[in-house]
Swiss-Prot record:
Subunit details: Homodimer.
Keyword set includes Cell wall biogenesis/degradation: no
Names of the cofactor(s): Mg(2+)
InterPro entries: HAD-like_sf, HAD-SF_hydro_IIB, HAD_sf, NTF2-like_dom_sf, SPP-like_dom, SPP_C, Sucrose_Phosphatase, Sucrose_phosphatase_pln/cyn
Pathway: Glycan biosynthesis; sucrose biosynthesis; sucrose from D-fructose 6-phosphate and UDP-alpha-D-glucose: step 2/2
Protein's organism: Oryza sativa subsp. japonica
Protein name in UniProt: Probable sucrose-phosphatase 3
Phylogenetic placement of the source organism: Eukaryota, Viridiplantae, Streptophyta, Embryophyta, Tracheophyta
First and last residue of the signal peptide: none
Domain of life according to the entry: Eukaryota
Function, in words: Catalyzes the final step of sucrose synthesis.
Family: Belongs to the sucrose phosphatase family.
Amino acid sequence: MDKLDGSARLMIVSDLDQTMIDHNDPKNLSLLRFQALWESEFSQDSLLVFSTGRSPISYRGLRTQKPLITPDITIMSVGTVIAYGEEMIHDVGWAEFLSNKWDRDIPERSQGPHKVSFFVDKEGAREVMDSLPETLNRRGLDVKIIFSSGEALDVLPQGAGKGQALLYLLKKFNSDGKPPNSTLVCGDSGNDAELFSVPSVHGVMVSNAQEELLQWYEENARGNPMMIHATERCAAGIMQAIGHFNLGPNVSPRDLEFPYPKLDAIKPADVVVKFYVLYEKWRQGEVQKAPFIIQYLKRITHPNGTTIHPSGRECSLHASIDALSSCYADKQGKKFRVWVDRIVASSIGTINWLVRFDKWEMEGNVRYCCLTTLLLTMKPETEDGFEITHIHKTWLEGYSAGNEHACIL
């Protein structure tokens, strides 16, 4: 991981299903709230790690269904696969390590080279967990058995698992002289228990944690000040833990009332996130239809600033804002969401910033994405402290829209 020159301020290692993603929340509100917080406050100096029981194929499928941002590292198949960045470059060293005393064919696409999974009833799980390791050991295989979600039984190499994968990453960071300043692990089920056993990490069990994890907590971690059982579900519980352990800001830009307060220090990533949160709320009709909102958008954009649409058409920023003013509540009731991903802010001089990011819009099951570049000038003497001078957008291949109305700003 070469994203950071030094140690990560915070590394969050989170399970996905029913931890980061609440499958009982069809609007994905808690997920979007957390991700807005992450992109605005942490993305430039911290690391986000998804640690899931899903196989790489299943994980990629999930990304097409949910509005997920791109993690820095993805741990899949219950800790048996480690991949880096958007390209998901696999860690070959980890795969080679796991191959010791492990041998299997791969007859099913839902299985993995270092994971064999079954569904078993809860009553029979204990008997299988007691007898299977000994049986496999007699065949020269050194394995561990993990039961989670009340039905999933995973057979892994003894050196595998979510906890072992995290220890491997921490060892790599330490050897590079870049240990994270703080690490927060987050989970809801039995296959997450190993994460909480890693030394010196903070941990949060979300409020909807399952019975097997709660039982593990009672037997192994009750009274541990480094671990809490949140009162909030899923991603909201992760934000609760950030505040509880004083790991950084934990109020999402999506939870702020407009007008936004002026900050002492303007962060380019925060500017971008708030800009598009307001854009979404305007089109959803979740803010009042008031002239001062359009006036604010014009105030924070240069009068001669330009925007280049994905078609190549150029127009003034203020003209785009005028177009937006006529779109108030046009997406109300249409499951419309906007989020930004992969923000990279680069200083170009003393007061100017070039900010690159993916800007996503989703309506129902249809989504669009613009690869976006935004030029920002810091103006501490002004009411808002900054000014947007240019926005340039191109369609991400495979995610273009048939009309520019889908990507006004």
